[in-house]
From Swiss-Prot:
Chain's gene name: cfoF
A biological-process GO annotation: flavonoid biosynthetic process
The organism's place on the tree of life at top rank: Eukaryota
UniProt-annotated binding residues for FAD: D45, R46, D47, K48, R126, D327
Name of the protein: Monooxygenase cfoF
Pfam families referenced in this protein's UniProt entry, alphabetically: FAD_binding_3
Originating species: Aspergillus candidus
EC number: 1.14.-.-
Cofactor(s) of this protein: FAD
Amino acid sequence: MTREHFLEGKDIVVAGAGVAGLAFALNLQRQWGDNVPPLRVVVYDRDKREVDLRRQGYSQTLSGIKEDTGLVVLKQLGLLDKVIDGAVMTDAISKFTIWDKDWNASPSFNVPAYGDMPTSAVRIPRRVLRTILIEAAEAAGIEVHWSVSCEDFEYLDDGRVGIRLRNADDGEIIETRACDLLVAADGANSKIRTILRPDDTLQYTGLMMMGGVAEFPHGAVPDHIRDKWGMVLTDQGISCFLSPTSQMGYHWGLSWWEQSPRAPPATWSIEYTQSLKSEALRRSRVIADPFATIVKRTDPSTMFIMAGMDKRPFSHEHLRKVVFIGDSNHAFSPLAGNGANVALKDGYDLAEQLCKASCMDDAISQFDRESVPRALRTLDRSHERIASAHTTQLDRDQFTDGSGANDFLVGQQHSDK
């Protein structure tokens, strides 16, 4: 780094301490180095530091099959060993399974890891990945403020950006903070995006999803799913995702076509949770046991219902002093299976381009050239998965030769350059 860098003496605010926001902050500090004046980077997040089981209780895939995947990013950040230690599966691709409604399973397959990566994919609870990134940020001295949301945005007369900060607990306005660059990583329902791109809204995929985390004390996981994860496919337009979250917990997510999206309740009650379980049992009657057992053993505090939403990515040529990364730019439905990988790479790449470029516009333009096509590939693949998982004309060959599982999980992503 030279001493004449355009970011010297500048203030950067990151809205959102999720995967994308923390990957950005960590790599920016790493790339910036110690031999120039330090950057002033502050991260705000509307959530508390503690875990919300309904939002953080599931696990996700981190891939290491290509250079631009999540595990490679985490290795570059020095966090790979911690992620592998925290994973519930360290050989996730070979454990991926497609079951039919009677639990006949597809053969396993594998994909080589990229370079010297120790594995091609892991499954890790979202809460564990979040904690690893938070602790890394705290250890690096990155300033993170919890329960503070970035509510409003304006361009100031001096060319900087003004951000109104609100206490997420009591709703009180804290202050208006000025900065030279705002990195919006505030999720699929980004408030910053609503202000700057009010027509760029989430689109309903046609799928509703409900599920939770079933508990099996003493390792009494049903043999059908033990040490596996994947999808139950039927020929009834309904499917179910299954994945371990711990030695005793299994996340399940039932999905089906529904004409209009349903919103989750404003407040959760025991009665509503039980009604969701009853609906899940009714909708999944076509799936043989142990699925009913899985539903009945679900921890009520982990139950969820959500509409499958997504949106296309966008570039920043008409925006000034603000960059959207992760879900705030390109939201994926859960069936995309690649959201965390793309978010990690977004954060990492933006930091790298800001440190390498000679001006902010060049950095953001190069970021767009890499991030937008990457997100579009994941979005297109997500729509293919949604269609194949909810067909009424199931291809039985995928249960005999393993090609169905390979196509469903990896598709064309492994061959992307």
